[in-house]
Amino acid sequence: MLPIILDLASLKALYAAGTVTPLDVIEVVIERRAAWPDKAVFITPTSDYDLRAAAKSLMEKSPQPNSLPLWGIPFAVKDNIDVAGLPTTAACPAFEYRPEADATVVARLRAAGAIVIGKTNLDQFATGLNGTRSPHGAPRSVFDPAYVSGGSSSGSSVTVAAGFATFALGTDTAGSGRVPAAFQNLVGIKPTPGLLSNIGTVPACRSVDCITIFAATVGDGVAVRKVAEGFDAADPFSRRANWAELPTTGLRVGVLDGAEREFFGNEEVEKLYDAAIENIRSLGATIVPFDYTPFREAAALLYDGPWVAERLAAVEGFIATNADDFDPTVRGIIEGAKGRTAVEAFNGKYRLEELRRKTEATWAKADVLLLPTSPTTYTVEEMLADPVRKNSHFGRYTNFVNLLDCAAIAIPAGFDSEDHLPAGVTLIAPAFTDDALAPLADALHRLAARGMGRDKAATLPEASKVPAAPSSLVPIVVVGAHLTGMPLNKELTGPGGRLIKSCRTAGDYRLYALPGTVPPKPGMVREPGFAGEGLAVEVWELPPAAFGQFVARIPAPLGVGKITLDDGSAISGFLCEPYALVGAEEVTHHGGWRAYVASRA
């Protein structure tokens, strides 16, 4: 007996126990797929015959259970991503072509033992966040067929939430790999742009497109991402990962301030967002309200600025001869770019960089952002009556993410007070924090505790839990000119340093103002037996390479040694050679360098 949701950890456990085989799983997939009442989920399902043949072939070539990372795992593919042997249409029948090769990501997943169960429906040419812009019909919410599934990766999200795929591939330009996750009680893994190859994908906005992963748990999604990722020289937008870390303690989480909160009248989603804030606070995070304005203005550039011309560039030749084959709303959006000029494109780029600079103020005080995935939802009828404006509501908190080069993980946040529809939140951080975000996203998902996909009662498997990654960041205690707001603080912030906490040393340290230093610097020494109140200091973290460079620049008579803090911990920090204190003014009684400097102002 298979679970309702075919999560990766559960299937692997069943395979390891010999309880089921890939062929058994495929038979259940065939049965569930046929019985599902929503017939708009797939554009081209893999035939029953081919599914059985794929399972049998896998078992013959790799008979040992779990001998491949995704051995016997069923997955669906959005129909703007190539699968050899199945047509690619981008939800436009006249655009159909038959690829001879898999997309790079699909090839990697198949090589790892995963089995494609079909090509899924989408908003045509991945233009939309709602799922209604397709000639094949609109996939629906698995919780209420009156409601949209979310898009553009509509069918992909349903396959996982309904229980006939373990994971599914989507794409994400403006939120298409995150909004459907929120509406289907799923996880949406939105990698750093360039982490997954886009070769074999029909572009929407090629410079910011990402292949994404829908999964039941964060652990499942990360496991799939690790198989799929990797530099691809054939893709000019592919990037080699330069992994970044997040603080393991003292994490600062940015949340919407009052002025930028907009839920379009949906108080239920707002309550779930507030609950998520309290949940992440319970995990030890410091909550930091921030001004969303520059992020919102960057988001507006995707559809209201020159980036819409990138959608025209993707299909320019085809729309010139086949305009009548387009969904009317999609056609209107793409043809609206025809008047855009190169001057507008450059001005748009300049504006984006201005806004990026403005967002640096937020990233200086927050390590991660926690935002609603979508501030509201609508019925299919409501969406069709007002397709552009209501669609834009879904993207209010998603459209900026790729433009500003961020990683994101969308997770379920629970259900409304009537236990009817789900909502989600998204954790967002700068590029290549993908791995660092995962443990936090997993912990937050587990606190929501509302199952997986359509199975609200399901328990997230312990086997899929994402462990906290050990930090390689190096802590350092600063005493004087490197404190926040002091002249040399930029030597910490420039190479990616993060303030962890303000605290005090143990009581046996003394502080002196060193004569002739520019900018003025203190010297701190430890004197066993001295009974003071401790000195005000800050603990920062630096990447290892930056720490080494930082220490190498420290001028005599200063150096680095272990400093004992008032909590008994010992951390590397600034100390002074005793010879330099001859004739120096003692300023210990001020309690710290900042207070001493203020006393001289």
What do the predicted segments below correspond to?
Residues T19-E27, K56, G265-D291, V315-T321, ...:
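Acyltransferase
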Residues S10-A16, E31, N121, P247-T248, ...:
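Serine-dependent amide/ester hydrolase catalytic core
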Residues V29, G221, V253, I280, ...:
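Residue-level signal for inorganic ion chemistry
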Residues D102-A228, N402-F415, L421-T426:
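Short glycine/serine-rich loop segments
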Residues P69-C92, G250-L256, P306-E360, K365, ...:
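Short helix-loop capping/hinge segments that flank enzyme active sites or metal/cofactor-binding pockets
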Residues D442-L447, M452-A601:
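Glycine-aromatic micro-motifs
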Residues L2-A174, E278-G284, A361, L492-T493:
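Gly/Ser-rich catalytic/binding loops embedded in alpha/beta enzyme cores
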Residues K190-A275, P294, P439-A468:
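A short helix-breaking turn/cap at a secondary-structure junction
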